[in-house]
């Protein structure tokens, strides 16, 4: 062990000198290595492998002074204690690395805590729960429970990380039946700012438990989630259908009507319109059963398509297939807004204005080499918000009296030289989109309703907590003051939607 630490010290000192890395952070890394915590040093194979495991290459480009990879809650506690002692070290926490926002799960001139070794899957048949590690991808979590005939409420693309998705709410193909992913958590194992390991659930630390459901990483670092499991049919019906842009009116009407009229909680859709540079629609259709009733998706299936991958398959297979749509090797920017689902009277005109605005924004950058743009139109039927409330609620707290529409732009491009243009366009998208929704509301075309934002879809510069109900935000602040009175996570974690 001593020889390993000596070699590591030499390596770190060399890197610190060559790259300007912090000497203090290097000492912190060596201290944890001496305590038996796994630490990756710059230029090592494990370090470089971890760095490649991001969705956006803009995050890959950030270089931490070292990567700490705890294997259990005790290791995580040691890491937190060491960072506390350093006084100034800043850090980021990584689950799946899917957020394209720089500094959320990536860092430069600081240390990265990777949860890659926290990949436990422990099923309890008696309680119908499973313990999941935050380092899992959803395809691993679902695949690990497949032979038990069980599944969990989680990501719709298999390559997304468990930790980040749950802490941000987590929309799922199963949400119509069971609410958000975070509503299905029965216990969080958490390392607090003082290094204490606690459990947060309905009876132990219940206030902490309540605000961690969709409150992101403001209160501690989760080392294990205990989640409800649900019986899963061997086969479900799902896949995607592709349409050319000539069917935009029919598709937007179908999406709007699905949000209002669908009564089958096993049915779920995602509508996306894409420019690269021509206009193509991709609609994800999922039914949690071997075959949907004929009328559930009729408004979509009757539109002529140019490609159709929908079939009977396992839920796990569907998640793996959906990974096809995770574009790799590019930089990414995202931004989002929330609208109440418009009525049939104004629905198409409002949807058209939303798509026209996205098209106008896309015109600002679509000639940049390697650029592409998509707009997701995600219906959020009131059944999801109802199930969420029945399960104890969550921080966002969408109002179950309304059907909502979640809108998200996602932009990809190749070179950092175009960053400022893309980020300006993304900001223009969500700022003007928000103004449009306010205008439609003032004109009486949309009802005046509480419209929180979906945290996992947001740009780093958006104000998640500013759109949360004031009473919920005050409750979250009270918990933060109790568990992190020195603002450790608020001031020392580089990214995320900080509560204050």
Swiss-Prot record:
The keyword Flavoprotein applies. It is an enzyme of class 1 (oxidoreductase). Transmembrane segments: none annotated. The keyword Protease does not apply. Gene3D superfamilies: 3.30.465.10. One of its GO terms (cellular component) is extracellular region. Glycans are attached at residues 43, 194, 201, 246, 299, 414. Residues 60-232 form the FAD-binding PCMH-type domain. Residues 1-20 form the signal peptide. Keywords: FAD, Flavoprotein, Glycoprotein, Oxidoreductase, Secreted, Signal. Its EC number is 1.-.-.-. The modification Pros-8alpha-FAD histidine is found at residue 98. It is found in: Secreted. Its cofactor is FAD. GO terms for molecular function: FAD binding; oxidoreductase activity. Disulfide bonds: none annotated. Belongs to the oxygen-dependent FAD-linked oxidoreductase family. This is Uncharacterized FAD-linked oxidoreductase ARB_02372. The lineage of its organism: Eukaryota, Fungi, Dikarya, Ascomycota, Pezizomycotina.
């Amino acid at each position: 062990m001593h020889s390993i630490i000596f070699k590591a010290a030499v390596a770190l000192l060399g890197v610190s000198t060559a790259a300007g890395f912090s000497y203090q952070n290097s000492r912190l890394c060596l201290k944890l290595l001496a305590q038996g915590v796994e630490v990756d040093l710059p230029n090592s194979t494990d370090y470089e492998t971890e760095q490649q495991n991001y969705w956006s290459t803009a995050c890959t480009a950030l270089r931490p002074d070292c990567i700490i990879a705890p294997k259990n809650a005790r290791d995580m506690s040691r890491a937190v204690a060491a960072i506390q002692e350093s006084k100034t070290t800043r850090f980021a926490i990584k689950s799946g690395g899917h957020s394209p926002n720089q500094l959320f799960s990536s860092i430069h001139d600081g240390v990265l805590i990777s949860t890659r070794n926290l990949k436990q899957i422990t099923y309890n048949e008696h309680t119908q729960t499973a313990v999941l590690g935050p380092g899992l991808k959803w395809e691993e979590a679902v695949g690990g429970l497949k032979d038990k005939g069980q599944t969990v409420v989680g990501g719709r693309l298999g390559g997304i990380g468990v930790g980040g998705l749950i802490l941000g709410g987590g929309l799922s193909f199963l949400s119509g039946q069971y609410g958000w992913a975070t509503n299905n958590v029965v216990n969080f194992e958490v390392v607090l700012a003082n290094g204490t390991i606690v459990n947060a659930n309905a009876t132990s630390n219940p206030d902490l438990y309540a605000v961690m459901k969709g409150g992101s990483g403001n209160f501690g670092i989760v080392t294990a989630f205990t989640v409800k499991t649900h019986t899963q049919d061997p086969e479900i019906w799902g896949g995607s259908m592709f349409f050319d842009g000539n069917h935009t009116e029919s598709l937007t009407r179908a999406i709007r009507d699905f949000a209002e009229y669908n009564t089958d909680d096993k049915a779920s859709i995602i509508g996306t319109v894409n420019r690269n540079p021509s206009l193509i629609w991709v609609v994800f259709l999922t039914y949690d059963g071997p075959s949907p009733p004929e009328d559930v998706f009729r408004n979509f299936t009757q539109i002529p398509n140019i490609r159709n991958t929908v079939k009977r398959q396992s839920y796990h297979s569907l998640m793996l297939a959906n990974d096809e749509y995770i574009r790799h090797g590019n930089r990414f920017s995202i931004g989002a807004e929330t609208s109440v689902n418009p009525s049939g009277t104004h629905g198409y005109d409002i949807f058209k204005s939303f798509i026209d605005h996205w098209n106008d924004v896309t015109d600002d950058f679509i000639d940049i080499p390697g650029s592409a743009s998509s707009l997701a139109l995600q219906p959020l039927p009131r059944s999801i918000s109802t199930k969420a409330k029945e399960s104890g609620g969550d921080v966002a707290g969408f109002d179950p009296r309304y059907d909502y529409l979640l809108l998200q732009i996602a932009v990809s491009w190749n070179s950092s030289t175009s960053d400022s243009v893309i980020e300006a366009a993304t900001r223009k998208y969500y700022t003007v989109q928000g103004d449009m929704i306010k205008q439609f509301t003032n004109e009486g075309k949309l009802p005046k309703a509480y419209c929180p934002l979906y945290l996992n879809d947001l740009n780093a510069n958006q104000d998640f907590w500013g759109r949360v109900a004031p009473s919920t935000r005050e409750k979250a602040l009270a918990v933060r003051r109790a568990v992190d009175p020195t603002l450790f996570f608020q001031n020392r974690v580089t990214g995320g939607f900080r509560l204050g």
